[in-house]
Amino acid sequence: MGGSELEELKKYITNIPDFPAKGIIFRDVTSLLQSGEGFSAAVDEMLKQLDDIEFDAVLGLEARGFLFGAPVAYAKKKSFVPVRKKGKLPRATVSAEYELEYGKAEVEIHTDSLKKGDKVVIIDDLIATGGTLEAAAKLVEQLGAEVVRIVCLIELTDLKGREKLKKYDVRSIVNYEGK
C-alpha cells in the first residue's frame, strides 16, 4: 500500500467526537474489524512492516493488540505472547508499571513466554502516550529478550508517544493529529 492507500484504511476507522471526554476524538477500530476488507488490509500492512526483519515472537497488548497481534503471529508462524493487566495470568509472571493520567497501572507476561535472546515484535492498535508500549518493552527486556520492532495501526502524533519509545524501531500505519 502506498501513502494514499494507507490513508484509505482511515475510512474503516470511525471517529467518535467527545469520547471518552469533551475535546477528545476517539478512533474506533471496531468498525475496521467489522469489515473483512478493512481488517485484512490492516493486518496485511502490519505484516509488510515485518518483511525485513527476523523475529521469534509477537507480543500483543490487551485487548485490541490481541486482535492484530494474533493474526500476525499466525501468518508468520511465530508464538503469540499476550500482555495482560496485572492479576489476569495464572502462572509465574514478570510485571512492569506505567503511568496513567491519575495514577499507575501494571501489565505482565508469563516468565516462560520468552527465552533469553528472543527477538520480539510488539503489536498494538494504537500509540497514544506510549506508556503501555514502553511497559511491554520492559517486560521483554526483563526476560532477556530484545524488542526488534513495535508496530501499531494508529498513531496519535500530537500525544508524542513515539518520543517515549525513541530507543525502539516504531512503525505506525495511519497517523492522526489531535487527541
Identify the role of each PLM range.
Residues 2-55:
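Active-site-facing substrate-recognition patch
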Residues 5, 11, 135-179:
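PRPP-dependent phosphoribosyltransferase catalytic core
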Residues 44-97:
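Conserved PRPP/pyrophosphate-binding segment of the phosphoribosyltransferase/PRPP-pathway fold
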Residues 56, 118, 148:
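Conserved acidic residues
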Residues 60, 122-123:
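Generic enzyme active-site microenvironment
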Residues 67, 131, 135:
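Conserved SAM/SAH-binding loop-helix junction
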Residues 79-121:
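Short, glycine/charge-rich flexible loops or terminal/linker lids adjacent to PRPP-binding catalytic cores
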Residues 125, 130:
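Conserved G/P- and acidic residue-centered "switch" motifs that form tight phosphate/ATP-binding loops
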